[in-house]
Amino acid sequence: MKKKVLAMLLAFAMTFSLAACGSSGGDKKQASSDATEESGTDEDAIPENEITGDPSAKDAFVIWAWNTDFTTLQDLLVKKYPDLKDRLVFVNCGGSSYYQDKIDALLEDPGNELYPDMMLLEVGYVQKYVQSDYLMSLKDLGITDADTADQFSYNIELGSDKDGVQKASFWQATPGCIQIRADLAEKYLGTTDQAELEKMFSNWDSILEAARKVNDASGGKVKLFSGYDDLKYIFLNGARTVGWYDDNDVIQMDPAMEEYMEYSKTLYDEDLTFNTTMWGTDWAALKDGDGEKSEACIAFAGCPWYTYWSLTDTWDKNTILVDAPVQFYWGDTGLAATAKCADKDVAAEIIKSCTCDKDFMTSIYKANGDFVNNQKAISDIVANSVKGASTFSLYGDQNIPEFFSTRGQNVDVSLVTAEDMTINETLFPAAVTAYATGKSDMDTAIKDFKAAVHDTYSYLKVE
């Protein structure tokens, strides 16, 4: 097991920077790859760490992250525990593309003054660290099952190792949805009624029918979805029935993933999307198009943080949330204390406050709008109409926390592995694009995909 973990860490070090590049949507619709190039960063320009606090102080407690989101929580913590004000050292590594490489080196160097006592973890790679010896269990910190009882169960599973020992604890929950622009839905789908839209988006056949209807009615100026890439998390984080490899470490292809490849090809061949890649400039521009003078799309896959912070003003009071054909999740950020954490008591205070304490987690929602990983807190937020940091609101009488409050109970993460981030973000999308755009047939695309997975993770086998 130790050899496998070391091999996995090496594979991540070599491939993680590729994940930021993603895969483009194809040839005739080349805008997605162009947007990636425009929005990409120079991989050689590794940013300096931004450090707040004094890491050389004898009682310094060092927390690592890839952005500044945690500073809102840190401000709340300092109010609750004033003694932490001069002790906490916050390190922002400068971006998620650099986080793992930087922190992996420090995890092997506990004598370094920047060694993390606590580290933030994204859901995409949390299992990489949870399955290693680099993290301390919550029970070692004195945090019990009773403390985490109100967390969504899928987040507990994501933060636990193969033996069910929880090492990471999430303050966010991110069940997925489909976000529909009401004005365009009324014009091209003929309704803004949530129940009717739920039916349209309840299965992939009816979604395809709606996509054709929108495309024909708008003369191609409006599409239902921006690109097949926009559907990937629904399939990857909701539709799978088998993992990327079996108990014998043999790489396998889930039938649901083949279905996604076929679905993507249909969308591409029939020109039913703009073939954009998520986060590209062309993808972003479609949110504000009017469908006449400028191109637009009606729906985006989403989740709480996306709804609050990634939709534009065009969508404010103009967004209807519905379920996808399968329940999925997208994101989550959590906390973990490292094995050589300098102060277990401080680590316990932070993790219990940020991920277990109903009242404190409600204050997080008020401060930054996060849909928190505490079912009692969410129930109180809904019942008492608690105002969060975001002023974004939905169409009609829909309520964001209320909509998502029950969706997190149905998320299945039993197939998540430590390798998922690289496979899901880089290797599999390349296979989807190769097949959808006609560069490879299905058998070749799958064969090349399996070979790429093996090349990245040599301990995974192709048969």
Identify the residue ranges that each predicted region occupies.
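Conserved N-terminal structural module of periplasmic/extracytoplasmic solute-binding proteins
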Residues: 6-7, 21-127, 346, 440-463
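Hinge/lid segment of periplasmic solute-binding proteins
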Residues: 40-51, 121-177, 319-323, 390-395
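Pocket-flanking alpha-helical
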Residues: 75, 96-137, 149-168, 205-218, ...
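Extracytoplasmic ligand-binding clamshell segments of periplasmic binding protein
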Residues: 98-101, 239-324
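Extracytoplasmic/periplasmic substrate-recognition and gating elements
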Residues: 108, 312-377, 430
